[in-house]
Amino acid sequence: MVVSLLEKVRALNPIVANVANGVTIDQVANAQNAIGASPIMSNAPEEAEGIVTIAQAITINIGSLWAPQIQEMMALMTAAYQQQKPVVLDPVAVGSLAYRQQIIEQLLILDTPTLIRGNAGEIAYFAGIDWQANGIDAGHGNSDPVIIAKAAANCLHTIILLTGPTDIITDGQRVTLISNGTSLFQTHVGSGDMLSGLCGAFVAVHPADPYQAAIEAAATFAVAGELVATAMETPLPGTFYPQLIDYLFHITPAKVANTVQLSEVPTHE
């Protein structure tokens, strides 16, 4: 695997505008900053147009909804559409809660996100496939996650990054699998939010190919987490996060390329 976008993020220091989950806002900002991007966080709809103007990408996370934040999400989606800026959407718990589904449907009316990052329970919602989502967690179901991801991508005509023990990236036809990672991602609330933030940084510097941006963001994050867990004498969630930030700061394209376990699913005509 050729890893070219990590150094591009560090060289260009792209501004990524974030409507973040209030639970993990500092984690997302620190992850983006560590990887080389410049995060800006906002909850004020009045500044949405100005923020989109200066940003190279926008990430929207519905993890902790409140009225002014929802208004800004709508304003950001409108401005991003008008200014043709890439948008990463993290639809936290959309598979479990009807109100969140309403908000997502309103956002989709305004524009189609460039990339959607979620777990199986969240992505299954977009695919219209039955899945027993468990709040913010993936839950369980009988469908093949690859089928779920492809169906969602084809329904929305966008890039899907379905995260889990194996990360799945698809545009509805091509499918890339990344098998790195650590179980500590599941014990640290905010891991998915951080990855969505990194997707924003990578797509900011490579908006013409969000599929490749998603692959490289997912590979970088999964490899960093795996290396942290491997290096820890006693892998514990409380010490995992700060070391993950350190690894994101120091990780090199060569380390990602040499460590990533990546495979392509054959395309059947």
Please give the residue ranges for each predicted region:
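Conserved post-catalytic alpha-helical subdomain immediately downstream of the catalytic base
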Residues: 189, 200-242
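Short pre-catalytic strand/loop immediately N-terminal to key active-site residues, enriched for Gly-Thr
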Residues: 179-189
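N-terminal loops that bind phosphate or other acidic moieties
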Residues: 2-7, 11, 79-84, 105-106, ...
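Charged C-terminal helix
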Residues: 223-269
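Conserved phosphate/ATP/ADP-binding segment of small-molecule kinases
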Residues: 100-175
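Conserved N-terminal subdomain of the carbohydrate kinase-like
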Residues: 2-89
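Glycine/small-residue-rich loop that forms an oxyanion/phosphate-binding "nest" at active or ligand-binding sites
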Residues: 69-118
